[in-house]
Amino acid sequence: MLYQSETIQVSWLKDGIAELVFNAPAAINKLDTKTVASLDKAIASLEQQTGLKGVLLRSEKTAFIVGADITEFLSLFDSPVEKLQEWLNFSNSIFNRIEDLPVPTISAINGYALGGGCECVLSTDFRVASPDIRIGLPETKLGIMPGFGGSVRLPRLIGTDNALDIIAAGKDIGAEEALKNGLIDAVVPKEKLVDSAVSMLEQAIAGNLDWKAARQPKLEPLKLNETERGMSFSVAKGMVMKVAGPHYPAPITAVKSIEKAATFGRDEALKQETASFIPLAQTNVARALVGIFLNDQYVKGLAKKHLKEVTIPEYAAVLGAGIMGGGIAYQSARKGIPVMMKDISQQSLELGMNEAAKLLNKQFERGRLDAIKMARTLSSIQPTLNYAGIEQAQIVVEAVVENPKIKAAVLSETETLVNEDCVLASNTSTIPISELAKSLKRPENFCGMHFFNPVHRMPLVEVIRGEKTSEKTISTVVAYASKMGKTPIVVNDCPGFFVNRVLLPYLLGFGLLLRDGGDFRQIDKIMEKEFGWPMGPAYLIDVIGLDTAHHSQSVMAQGFPDRMHRDYKDAIHVLYDNQRYGQKNGLGFYKYTQDKKGKPKKEQDEQTDQLLATICQQKSNFSGEEIIARTMIPMINEVVRCLEEGVIASPAEADMALVYGLGFPPFHGGVFRYLETMGTAAYVKMAENYAHLGALYQVPPGLKAKAERNESYYSTAATIAVSTGKTA
């Protein structure tokens, strides 16, 4: 053994060939600060070997290296600039030393080689891979860019256009594409990976493969003349700005950095990469996107704990074949859980099956499943007009019309037909679960399971715990939702649960703004372009449906009369009273026609202004700052109340529910990350300017207390001593 640490071993393999093996104690290899420090020492041990002829890098795990340890990022990014630069320089010096070894080097890649893992293999002369690999640089998805030489070596290895495509989009690619563009040199069966890599290394040692020629382009400027350079980068910058937009600076920064470094050799180009990386790492966008990644991992970890407690249902039933019921049945079947879809109408069943067939056909056309899988999936949805066979179901999801009496009757009837340990779940968006449970003999087996429309696209499922719901029931529903490919988040029962409860105050704030003379078109523009919502509030209400929004207002007003009751008619009431229901009937805040693809196209409608003029003050010109404050403060306050009341268990779960359920702008990271960025004291000070507008704008006491103590809702991670990799 030439060198050994907790994560890396270096030993002689044969005939002057040494192997450096990544072998972390955990299930996967990460390039955390400890491993980087170990890699420094491992390379030093190789540099001292006089008989060294070649070096093989490989992994003992099912994946090569999945990337850096993202749990360390927020602490690293909060370091002083000089510390962050020191860490990057130190890390890059290690990969330079791999690249500068006086012998040929090769990486044997299996599984994932992402981020720092990809940058590691780029530093070797050759790369051989198994067919199952995914390799790429996903950093821009985290609001940063490659920092270990990826933006320098990749374009010099595979060409500027190919590299920009991977780096700017944060892409990873498979073995076939990686071989085609030159990122890897060979694809071999997994069982022959190491032998093939050694054989290739022996060819290089013997002089049959020119390893110096393979290495040289990575040390030099890009092979582009001035005209080619201008064309490549101008096209890339235009595409990136169109796709990423102004709120996500990482992709365009990466492109500009590669452009600036195009005429530099490796060492100067790496300095440029570091100079571009550091400002990105210290942006609020990077903190938000890294926060989303960490929160997502946390939420998935909670779901895994539930999975340990129960068996995933193997057969399900869905009651109701409408938009939601049909979508739930499709998603269940698509993910391998056969499902019985029951309705009282043959026409509804046919519509449900047709919708499933249409979605499967789209998957088939995109090459995501073959004809056999498509047919098998469709045949695993059993449409029926009666309950025969429902006793086989381990879980039944009720998705009938949003009427408490009908839902209670259907659930009560179903309970008499299923096994005693069968779990019942109601897909409701507004009806309290504890109320529905009163019609059941086994309320402990019942909970809410709130899907979002369209079911096949929206990642969130709210799992609602009623007063008498058992933990086994919650775990079973979480397991089922996870198997369906969804992100389940458990919330406690209350009117609107979590997502709809916090959405309505946002819409009420919008209504107050209209009452005071705001223009819904300007508000939509500000909330989309400046704040970053996928849809402004008026457009969102049209998509939801004004009838649905009107009903939701009524339910929430009963549940929270002090904040959400309105003793006057607002915009939603007026448009609803005039049969303007939004996209569903072509008239809402906007009017809708169909485009060439048959999709709703939004247009202005003077009649809306005439109707709103009856309840709204004369038009006023609000600033973007005022519009954002007046719509967002009610939502932020309500989210905080939900945490304080225990409706939702943690800031991480709240933020993920907002991002996955409402499309809260990811670059803000969710309400609690947004509060952290602004600072709790600054938020309270801002909100106090609007306190005169009513109860919705009153800051919850817990948030005020945090502001007084200058506390955040997220704890700070341990700081990292970058030179040693030890936590401080």
From Swiss-Prot:
GO terms for molecular function: 3-hydroxybutyryl-CoA epimerase activity; delta(3)-delta(2)-enoyl-CoA isomerase activity; enoyl-CoA hydratase activity; long-chain-3-hydroxyacyl-CoA dehydrogenase activity; NAD+ binding. GO terms for cellular component: fatty acid beta-oxidation multienzyme complex. NAD(+) binds at residues 324, 343, 400-402, 407, 429, 453. Residues 1-189 are annotated as: Enoyl-CoA hydratase/isomerase. It holds the Pfam family 3HCDH. InterPro entries: 3-OHacyl-CoA_DH_CS, 3-OHacyl-CoA_DH_NAD-bd, 3HC_DH_C, 6-PGluconate_DH-like_C_sf, ClpP/crotonase-like_dom_sf, Enoyl-CoA_hyd/isom_CS, Enoyl-CoA_hydra/iso, FA_oxidation_alpha_subunit. This is Fatty acid oxidation complex subunit alpha. It comes from Photorhabdus laumondii subsp. laumondii (strain DSM 15139 / CIP 105565 / TT01).
